[in-house]
Amino acid sequence: MYYRNFIITSIEAERILAMKFDEAFAGVKKNVIDTLNQMGNGITRASYYTSCLMDNYQDVCSKLKQEDTRFIAGLAQLVKSRDIIFQMIKIYIETYFQNKKEEKAQYILKKLVGAGVYISSSGLTNRILIMAVATMICQTSRFNTVVYGRINRARSLVLKGSVTATAVVLNVYGLIQDAANSADNLKMHNSFYYNALYANHLEMIYFLIEPVITGVPYLNPMIISDDELAELLIKLMR
């Protein structure tokens, strides 16, 4: 009986050990794949810089240099101020309120309250409503999971995934290329928000909140109805 129990225990221990090994290997594999993909993006971006050697492609060269400069500027703001992510969400909501009269805030608030969102109506203005909604969005678990997950992934790829100076450079360039791709996509699909971020030197760190913004349908701020805006805000706060 003792040996039988010992064998069963040993088999169970080996099974658990194998499962742990598989989990660890899967984690390592994902980190390696992410790092290689990031370095691949870095190599691609570095190859774009060959355009600087050709007279006919100086516009491409100029765009790359501008993206690098603005990425660093955005990153500096992120490091300097803890509320930059909040500001980006606030700017997003502001683009939808720019053509809304002050009395619309009360109507939109009623829609939000009807959906289970509590915001005080005392002295309510568009500005106060924007601040309140932006705060609630930034406090949702989904928002924090997405945004801080992206921040940690970016930091991990640049630091933990880099063992040589070349790897560091390629990972950083890969990160900038990801940021540039996200900014270009935003410019194409939501030029109002892109222009607002650009004016604040924040479009190159938009990639950190991109999944949150693209998780809701795009609606033209110039023609969005009050009901559509309320529904958009409700989706962002869930």
Where are these regions (language model features)?
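An amphipathic alpha-helix signature
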Residues: 86, 105-106, 130, 134, ...
